[in-house]
């Protein structure tokens, strides 16, 4: 009498290895075996063909040996007299498998699926012939073909042709045949989205109203109970899987397994295009999109496409303005967790990124990468306009705006535009008067963290930047760069009005105010205006009577540093500034500059009322009294 055929089970399609056979496989082949078995089981579950059994996935994820799989199949006969698999009669399997009469099992997606024992035996027979039973036919170490891949083409063709009419997706076929079938696209009946085989199956199950695996906390539905169990741990915070190397905890065993590869150095997933290896299959899949150029994730706001969903999610925060990450110290909010982590080092003073060459530490990884270019000297990015080279592409992009005069960053408050985003961010703080970075030594506050870092050097007395030409040391790298131009004679900053060149950009900016007549710095006491902030600062000392610069030799005090420097020459009798024309020497460089005008006949100071010119500013000031 013909028996009713039960539902297909995971063990029906599982390829088993004995303990002796298992020893013939290398680590990569064992990983491949587990991945294939896990994928097949999950596809069966997603189709509703077998009951989700956590013990099976647990065994595979925990990397237990495959011969621990214990099957409970019973053998029965179908109406044709062939042997077929009869599964355990659980409540759900009965619901899915025990159809009226002798009808074959029909899964949730509506296509007929039968797999007879005789077909499975073909697999087992071929594997034993080509495999290594009891070490009688050991696998060669030089062989690149795993036992899983040695199923003959005749057997594969037999199964493919037989079941192709029943289902196109073929989730249980060998990987080689799945590759052919995957070329065909599959469409979800709910919202029309197109998937490849496994994705379409999973997606269809999610839409199925009969799906029982729903999270009671957030309403999210899952295709199998194991995924729901893992998901629930997000709400409970449970992390039952612990790494014995470092003690780190994980919510799922698969995450632990992936993490442990950091300690072992194992990278079993290899890219066939460039031979690069990866710890996880998901990282390999992401990497392969570099070769294919595939960017499947599209922003519906601006149509920009991305090769990773994480990049799309991050990008969408630009449109929404969402900044979910808040600093618990100062309340500042960020769009990315990485930005928050970098910011928090301001409060902690932590510098986790250390240079292996010189031991210098940095709070931000990007700063370390920039610093390492000093040691390597590598500058692969070249400007086509001026041939200047840069260590990073972003530096080149910023530099090129000098040539294009592009200023894409505009202030919404005053309309001022900038070529660099960092300049705009710095400028915005002038509207708010925000100075979040405070010195814990003297209480001085700064708008920028870099300004605070530079200020710290005043207290420490540290001058880490040394000139290789003369040995002079500086607090700031920019000061060393400017100083170095004394030796090279380089003056890269040129005035477009008169062609005068300068070694510093700040000197050019000050000079250009002569042409524009701009004097933006005004004294609150007397209303006098100046074209440089330093001139205003020096002037304000007249009102306060302050003389902060004191001579350590005689105690005489001065308003400005230059006055003290000139005075110190009296004590040392040092006259280091010599005129090359006549040999006369001076204690101050400014005195030499004034003297040098006698030889060249330069008279740069002009009276605006009568156009008379003078070689010294003091002579002009004295002359202007005639008009007043």
From Swiss-Prot:
Keyword Mitochondrion set for record: no
PROSITE patterns in the cross-refs: KRAB, ZINC_FINGER_C2H2_1, ZINC_FINGER_C2H2_2
GO cellular component, one term: nucleus
UniProt-listed GO biological process terms: regulation of transcription by RNA polymerase II
Pfam family, one: KRAB
CDD domains documented for this protein: KRAB_A-box
Record domain KRAB: where: 8-79
Protein location: Nucleus
Keyword vocabulary terms for this entry: DNA-binding, Metal-binding, Nucleus, Repeat, Transcription, Transcription regulation, Zinc, Zinc-finger
Single GO MF descriptor: DNA-binding transcription factor activity, RNA polymerase II-specific
Function of the protein: May be involved in transcriptional regulation.
Family statement drawn from the similarity comment of this UniProt entry: Belongs to the krueppel C2H2-type zinc-finger protein family.
Protein name per its UniProtKB record: Zinc finger protein 528
